[in-house]
């Protein structure tokens, strides 16, 4: 094998992309991963890390460009870790995401006949984030800086704009940055664990334009909060809620458990289809509202509701998808382990006069067995777990329920594929549709249809 040494400069042809969007060059079957390189490009790169089974390279020059290469429009792209694919055409991004799902499902497990649809993309894949979580820090000259983290670090890149955030969010960020400097408000220092302001979080209702601004603080005392509230109210009239979230933990967790309202309402509203949702500072709510409607519509297509079906919504959160389906179902039962989320789901059901819904707090595997003992037999089960996927106990319990259809939404196709192998005991994985919830990044969301085998 050809010798591979750190700091050596080499040339090669990119033959593949990793799930992180890095180009793959091979030297005698030894893989070298190079960020920002594209398939079929001839490149020059420097080896910056060499391990036994792989190496990492830094792109120096593109000798022969791919047709899929574009100039990243963001001036911070080379430094910031928020986006990974701005150097790639949007069509190529969608194709890459579908190909990753194909590789996961067609090459492992009994899923070679599963149909994998084209990725559902956006017409305009920018400015889509309805929630911005912006770290706050200080420069060496003690000026307030706000932006996003450098790749693989907690160094904040001071930014004036971000092309995937709502435009209003960057306007709020820039004004708050100015006011924090002007009022000389102390900023949290991650190393010394001292200072007050840790993060600025901004949420916007996509269809309502209501805005919530949250100051995440290291402790409850916030003496100049009234000054900031008055400035925000005056400059941004669509702000309907300003909150303080207290996080005095010495961890990377952004939000604490305790919040207080400094101005306006406790929650903002947004709509999906005909359903209105109340969203608090701590609520889980999909980041990309326009794509969420496409995701949920695809899930609804898979559910094939006629008005006669019992639907079970597991990992239901604030009831987002269950309430979306309720107008077309006989009854929706939702279960979630977070008590506040269940309260929000019940409030959202009441707000929308959806009386054919029942929500209960607890572990899904426990609650659905209780419902089973009460004679509740779901026709369709919705599954939308966190990135780690489903607990095996939950999946085996789900198999006991034996619904006709399972619609599984995932933000991590790797764990979805793992879970699918357990469900394959009784279910056929018929079809998967990738939905691009996070353009310019490597994140993939999928919705999958499982049908009980005896129904084929």
From Swiss-Prot:
List of residues binding [4Fe-4S] cluster = 74, 80, 83, 162
Q: Where is the signal peptide?
A: none
Supply the EC number(s). 2.1.1.-
Q: What SUPFAM superfamilies would the database entry show?
A: Nucleic acid-binding proteins, S-adenosyl-L-methionine-dependent methyltransferases
Active-site annotation: 411
**What are the TRAM domain coordinates in residue numbering?**
3-61
Q: Which Pfam families match?
A: tRNA_U5-meth_tr
* Regions crossing the membrane: none
What biological-process GO terms show up in the record?
Answer: rRNA base methylation
Q: Which residues form a coiled coil?
A: none
Q: What class of enzyme is it?
A: transferase
Domain of life according to the entry = Bacteria
Question: What keywords are assigned to this protein?
Answer: 4Fe-4S, Iron, Iron-sulfur, Metal-binding, Methyltransferase, S-adenosyl-L-methionine, Transferase
- Binding annotation for S-adenosyl-L-methionine: 286, 315, 336, 384
Mind telling me which CDD domains this protein's record contains? Answer: AdoMet_MTases
GO function terms (MF aspect): 4 iron, 4 sulfur cluster binding; metal ion binding; rRNA (uridine-C5-)-methyltransferase activity
User: Into which family does the record put it?
Assistant: Belongs to the class I-like SAM-binding methyltransferase superfamily. RNA M5U methyltransferase family.
Q: Which NCBIfam families match?
A: rumA
Q: What PANTHER family does this protein's entry cite?
A: RNA M5U METHYLTRANSFERASE, TRNA (URACIL(54)-C(5))-METHYLTRANSFERASE
Q: How is this protein named in the record?
A: Uncharacterized RNA methyltransferase SE_1582
What is the originating organism of this protein? Staphylococcus epidermidis (strain ATCC 12228 / FDA PCI 1200)
């Amino acid at each position: 094998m050809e010798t591979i040494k750190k700091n050596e400069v080499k040339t090669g042809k990119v033959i593949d992309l990793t799930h992180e969007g890095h180009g793959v060059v091979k030297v005698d079957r030894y893989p070298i991963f190079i960020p920002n390189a594209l398939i079929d490009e001839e490149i020059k790169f420097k080896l910056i890390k060499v391990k036994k089974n792989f190496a990492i390279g830094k792109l120096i020059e593109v000798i022969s460009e791919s047709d899929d290469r574009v100039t990243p429009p963001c001036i911070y792209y080379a430094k910031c870790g928020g986006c990974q694919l701005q150097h790639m055409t949007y069509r190529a991004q969608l194709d890459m995401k579908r190909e990753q799902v194909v590789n996961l499902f067609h090459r492992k497990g009994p899923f070679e006949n599963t149909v994998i649809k084209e990725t559902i993309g956006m017409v305009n894949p920018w400015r889509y984030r309805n929630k911005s979580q912006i770290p706050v820090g200080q420069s060496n000259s003690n000026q307030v800086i706000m932006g996003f983290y450098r790749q693989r670090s907690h160094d904040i890149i001071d930014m004036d704009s971000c092309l995937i955030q709502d435009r209003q969010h960057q306007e709020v960020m820039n004004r708050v940055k100015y006011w924090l400097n002007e009022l000389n408000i102390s900023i949290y220092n991650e190393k010394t664990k001292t200072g007050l302001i840790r993060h600025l979080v901004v949420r916007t209702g996509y269809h309502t334009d209501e805005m919530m601004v949250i100051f995440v603080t290291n402790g409850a005392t916030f003496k100049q909060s009234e000054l900031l509230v008055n400035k925000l109210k005056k400059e941004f009239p669509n702000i309907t809620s300003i909150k303080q979230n207290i996080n005095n933990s010495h961890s990377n967790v952004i939000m604490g458990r305790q919040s207080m309202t400094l101005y306006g309402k406790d929650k903002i509203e947004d709509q999906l289809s005909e359903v209105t949702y109340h969203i608090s500072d701590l609520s889980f709510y999909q980041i990309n509202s326009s794509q969420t409607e496409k995701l949920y519509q695809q899930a609804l297509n898979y559910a094939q509701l006629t008005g006669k079906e019992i639907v079970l919504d597991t990992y239901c959160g604030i009831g987002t998808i269950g309430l979306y389906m309720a107008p077309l179902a006989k009854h929706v039962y939702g279960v979630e382990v977070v008590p506040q989320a269940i309260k929000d789901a019940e409030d959202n059901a009441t707000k929308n006069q959806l009386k054919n819904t029942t929500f209960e707090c607890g572990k899904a595997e426990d609650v659905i067995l209780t419902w089973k003992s009460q004679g509740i037999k779901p026709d369709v089960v919705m599954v939308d777990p966190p990135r780690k996927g489903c607990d095996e106990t939950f999946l085996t319990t789900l198999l006991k329920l034996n619904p006709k259809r399972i619609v599984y939404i995932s933000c991590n196709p790797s764990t979805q594929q793992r879970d699918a192998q357990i469900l394959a005991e009784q279910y056929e994985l018929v079809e998967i549709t990738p939905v691009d919830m996070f353009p310019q990044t490597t994140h993939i969301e999928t919705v999958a249809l499982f049908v009980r085998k005896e129904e084929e």
